């Protein structure tokens, strides 16, 4: 299913439709402020396993991030962060960044693999943030493209994304052409903040 949603003014009815698909255990593809993302409800293990299978990822090694609507729920999933880290977030979100923090015990047991960290995203995109706000909890997210592959045209054009993934996901949101750059990733485990992947956007 390909669903057109305008990022400037997302239709609440369409937002509710996509949110219901996610709540029912669906996997969806959506625009962000960088590359299109693919994600599901973090609280549904079957959906998470399906997402990993679609992406061809080993859950022990897979890298996922959590998409939030704002900063209000982040502390529910990370260990306490320093004032410096919180100020870094406030200066740069919403924006094209992934911030790596230590995960706390509230992360679903499914993610208690070798990874003890969590990637935090608050994209500057009204569509996905409206969906997460309606859902009431963060969305487990991965980029549509394989990080080892070059960014191809199919992952910037939602119609081509639908042609490629439409038979394995429950919905693809057409929010216009996506970007061809991934997010910039910042390690915030300590206050010696380190950029571990250069992507779209400059840290303030």
What are these regions (language model features)?
Residues 1-204:
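Active-site-adjacent structural elements in enzyme catalytic cores
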